Amino acid sequence: MPQRILPRGQAIQSVGFIGLGNVGGKLAGSLLRNKCQLMVRDLDKTVAQPFIDASASWADSPKIMAEKCDIIITCLPSPAASAAVMEADDGILAGLSDGKIWAEMSTTDAAEVTRLGALVKERGADPVDCPVSGGCHRAATEDSLKPNRPC
């Protein structure tokens, strides 16, 4: 895997991706094509199977993913889905620690991203709002990310 550097200077070893739907699946596929060490999770494990077959590992919970990955990306269909994945007892927040990054790519609103970002910061991790534009067809071409910004 090409070396990538986290904001605090340490090398990125692994990326977690939750939400392998129409957009998320294409974005996660791009990470695999670019040789990232990828861990995946979706409500439907059969959706994740092609990623697992192509070298990704499976996370039994969002908490486990947050414990094991340097960056955790969420690409979920609603603010409620984001809140559930983040705040459940076995959610991302339960596994975050200092120096980790949470990148939010979900269909959500600014207030929810800001609220969840504050909870991420409380755990010593860094939240990044990563809006996606252009839908599935642009996600497939790796040309769908808007400029990223801290939450």
At which residue positions do the language-model features occur?
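Generic, ordered loop/turn and secondary-structure boundary motif
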Residues: G21, E87, L93-A94, S133, ...
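Rossmann-fold NAD(P) dinucleotide-binding segment
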Residues: P62-T74, P79-P127
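A generic "cationic amphipathic patch" detector
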Residues: A28, C36, F51, S82-V85, ...
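Rossmann-fold dinucleotide-binding core
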Residues: V15, T107-C151
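NAD(P)+-binding Rossmann beta1-loop-alpha1 motif at the extreme N-terminus of oxidoreductases
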Residues: P2-T74, K100, M105, C136-A139
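A short alpha/beta connector and helix-capping loop motif
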Residues: A54-P62, V85, A125, D143-K146
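Short alpha-helix boundary/capping motifs
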Residues: A59, P79-A80, N148-R149
